[in-house]
């Protein structure tokens, strides 16, 4: 993993090289804030960013919350420091091009595929759209196997990775998300009742893994567990997917234990904490 560049303390406020007005000025300021967060040791306080930018705290906060709404930055930890968001992957591939996470994860995904005999995926959380995005995959060798495109999106309420993420939210956050996004029915098994979904999420927290039982596609089952960063925040999930003929009722617990173990390995290797 590439060592993060420590934040430079006491940096003089930035001085614009050319005059800028309106939205262009706001865009320039926002991009500079994004760069400084990326150069930090993981997260930066609002006051430090404001000092670096030579802006009032209120203006800096407004720029950050705008980028947060689009998923480019996120708040982490009890102090609410600012860190890079996963949506950077969608527009600039910075999340993927660094190769740090994938270099750590891919061997673990391959081992999990060999152990389980099923296709294994890794997805990250896109906080702006509240969807899970597949960024890596190791397909099994069976003729009948699950296949999803890299960059493909998974619904939060009807996928293993999505429900693993949802289970880490508070009930208030889940309620707010469901009110905004709704519960689309993909199959007859999709959980379209908020009450039933919340009951399922409670079971996910208790087990340590989520279980998509033909809720996104008929005949397909998926189990997933979250990966956590250094702030104990979930940012990715590992999943095992396969047909119901192979992921049978008597093997669900076995597959669940496998995916929990793999997720813990990645969390530890990535320097995260649970």
From Swiss-Prot:
GO BP annotations, alphabetical order: glyoxylate cycle; negative regulation of DNA-templated transcription; regulation of DNA-templated transcription
Consequence when changing residue 143 to D: Strongly reduced promoter binding and tetramerization
Effect of residue 220 to D: Loss of promoter binding and tetramerization
Record-annotated IclR-ED domain positions: 101-272
DNA-binding region coordinates: 46-65
Molecular function GO terms recorded: DNA binding; DNA-binding transcription factor activity
Record bears the keyword Ribonucleoprotein: no
Domain HTH iclR-type: 24-86
UniProt: glyoxylate binding residues: 160-161, 212, 222, 239-241
GO CC annotations, alphabetized: cytosol
Top-level taxon of origin: Bacteria
Subunit organization: Homotetramer and homodimer. Homotetramer in its active, DNA-bound form. Homodimer in its inactive form.
Miscellaneous comment in the UniProt entry for this protein: Glyoxylate and pyruvate occupy the same site.
Protein name (record): Transcriptional repressor IclR
Source species: Escherichia coli (strain K12)
């Amino acid at each position: 993993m590439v060592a993060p560049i420590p934040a430079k303390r006491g940096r003089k406020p930035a001085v614009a090289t050319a005059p800028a007005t309106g939205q262009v000025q706001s865009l320039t300021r926002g991009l500079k804030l994004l760069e400084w967060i990326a150069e930090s040791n993981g997260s930066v306080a609002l006051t430090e960013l404001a000092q670096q930018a030579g802006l009032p705290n209120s203006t800096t906060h407004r720029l950050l919350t705008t980028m947060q709404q689009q998923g480019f930055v996120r708040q982490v930890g009890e102090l609410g420091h600012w860190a890079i968001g996963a949506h950077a992957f969608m527009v600039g591939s910075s999340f993927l091009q660094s190769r740090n996470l994938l270099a750590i994860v891919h061997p673990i995904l391959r081992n999990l595929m060999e152990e389980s005999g099923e296709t294994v995926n890794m997805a990250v959380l896109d906080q702006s759209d509240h969807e899970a995005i597949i960024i890596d995959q190791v397909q099994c060798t069976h003729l009948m196997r699950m296949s999803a495109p890299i960059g493909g999106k998974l619904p939060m309420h009807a996928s293993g990775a999505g429900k693993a993420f949802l289970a880490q939210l508070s009930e208030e956050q889940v309620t707010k998300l469901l009110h905004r996004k709704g519960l689309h029915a993909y199959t007859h098994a999709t959980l379209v009742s908020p009450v039933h979904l919340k009951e399922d999420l409670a079971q996910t927290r208790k087990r340590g893994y989520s279980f998509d039982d033909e809720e996104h596609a008929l005949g397909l089952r998926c189990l997933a567990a979250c990966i956590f960063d250094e702030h104990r925040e979930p940012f990715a999930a590992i999943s095992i997917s396969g047909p119901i003929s192979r992921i049978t009722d008597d093997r669900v617990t076995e597959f669940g234990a496998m995916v929990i173990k793999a997720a813990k390995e990645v969390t530890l290797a990535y320097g995260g904490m649970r």
